[in-house]
Amino acid sequence: CHEGAHILLMFLLGAPPALVKLTALGCRMVPNREKILSYGQMALVSFAGPGTNLLCAGGMFLLGLEAHPFFGANLVLGMLHSLPIEPMDGGMAFHALLRARMKGERADKLCFAVSLGLILPMAGLGFVILLRTRYNFTLLVMSLYLMLYLVLKRDLFSG
């Protein structure tokens, strides 16, 4: 429902994606060139996915289903994707909102700094978790992937 929310909102805004490309770590949507979304609309589209996850988790909580695995999955996915780290949805929304308020290069630099400022502690925490558990490397690997993406500005697993 996460990716579907992005696509549905793009259709509702009259700008369906020209191409939806599945990658190893999610989905990349190539924008439609016939209708360009405003920065505010881009931010809304970016938040549609994590917002849907958080709404699903909230609904499950209200129904007393917080022990169900989908509750935790939706909650974590929604919270993680809301972080203002590019290329996460929150980072894309943050970047769009910055570009609406300041010149492109300044917005790009600020978004990069905020993303890096959040990724570095995540990587440190991931390393601590790996040392303590001796097997859980998930946060460390995700942080390293995000750092490489941020520096290279491309999806490393997009095939």
Where are these regions (language model features)?
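Hydrophobic transmembrane alpha-helices and their immediate loop junctions
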Residues: 1-159
